[in-house]
């Protein structure tokens, strides 16, 4: 467990995203903090921009099969991401293209913004090689901000219904529960970076919130 801030913000999920193979993080992260992130998640960090922005957690999402990024990514950024991760990088087309905000995915499934086009769904399937379903979480369309998923669990918006939790468990093949981040924040995807090894929560996250995170994501057996 690590509590941290990036560029003075507790919303670490806006600025970073992780799988069990890599961590993408904004390029101005301090070396000491980068080392702490790498140790907690047991991965190598790739400091980068996407579309010239440090909000890489909002603009990218991936799993063991590939990486999905906004179509505004530059050729140089895309080439570097492919080189550093060793994975294919696919662009999310259309006006709704902040991939990390609108796609929630692990190695079993993807749950995405309800208004994504068929072309966008095809791009997601191509990048991540998993079944894709559209919908909302607690009436939030940007599902990547409303939840966090690993191959061990889902932590979701506190107003997620039991029916939706059951749906998420079926889609992702893991246990799902509700929680908050950063002293009551409902958009847990914006304040949490996690993989199967560990997690980084916003520095304002409370002890009880950490307990919910650890239970939902399988760190407490």
Curated annotation (Swiss-Prot):
A GO biological process of this protein is: cytosolic ribosome assembly
Q: Protein biosynthesis as a keyword? A: yes
Task: Answer whether the UniProt record assigns the keyword Phosphoprotein to this protein.
Answer: no
Which UniProt key words apply to this protein?
Initiation factor, Protein biosynthesis
Annotated Gene Ontology MF terms? ribosome binding; translation initiation factor activity
Q: Which domain of life is it from?
A: Archaea
Disulfide links within the chain = none
Role description = Binds to the 50S ribosomal subunit and prevents its association with the 30S ribosomal subunit to form the 70S initiation complex.
The family classification in the record reads: Belongs to the eIF-6 family.
Kindly provide the name given to this protein in its UniProt entry.
Answer: Translation initiation factor 6
- Source organism per entry reads Natronomonas pharaonis (strain ATCC 35678 / DSM 2160 / CIP 103997 / JCM 8858 / NBRC 14720 / NCIMB 2260 / Gabara)
């Amino acid at each position: 467990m690590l509590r941290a801030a990036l560029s003075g913000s507790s919303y670490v999920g806006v600025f970073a995203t992780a799988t069990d193979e890599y961590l993408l993080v904004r390029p101005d992260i301090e070396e000491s903090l980068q080392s702490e992130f790498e140790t907690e998640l047991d991965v190598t960090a790739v400091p980068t921009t996407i579309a010239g922005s440090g909000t890489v957690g909002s603009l990218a999402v991936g799993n063991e099969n590939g990486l999905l990024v906004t179509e505004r990514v530059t050729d140089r950024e895309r080439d570097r991401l492919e080189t550093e991760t060793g994975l294919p990088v696919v662009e999310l087309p259309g006006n709704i293209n902040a991939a990390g905000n609108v796609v929630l995915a692990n190695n079993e499934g993807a749950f995405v913004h309800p208004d994504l086009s068929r072309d966008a769904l095809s791009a997601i399937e191509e990048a991540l090689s998993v079944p894709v379903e559209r919908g909302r979480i607690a009436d939030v369309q940007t599902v990547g901000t409303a939840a966090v998923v690993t191959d061990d669990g889902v932590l979701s918006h506190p107003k997620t219904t039991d029916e939706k939790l059951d749906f998420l468990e079926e889609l992702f093949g893991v246990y799902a529960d509700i929680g908050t981040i950063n002293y009551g924040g409902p958009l847990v995807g914006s304040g949490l970076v996690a993989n199967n090894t560990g997690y980084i929560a916003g520095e304002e996250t409370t002890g009880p919130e950490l307990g919910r995170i650890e239970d939902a994501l399988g760190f407490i057996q």
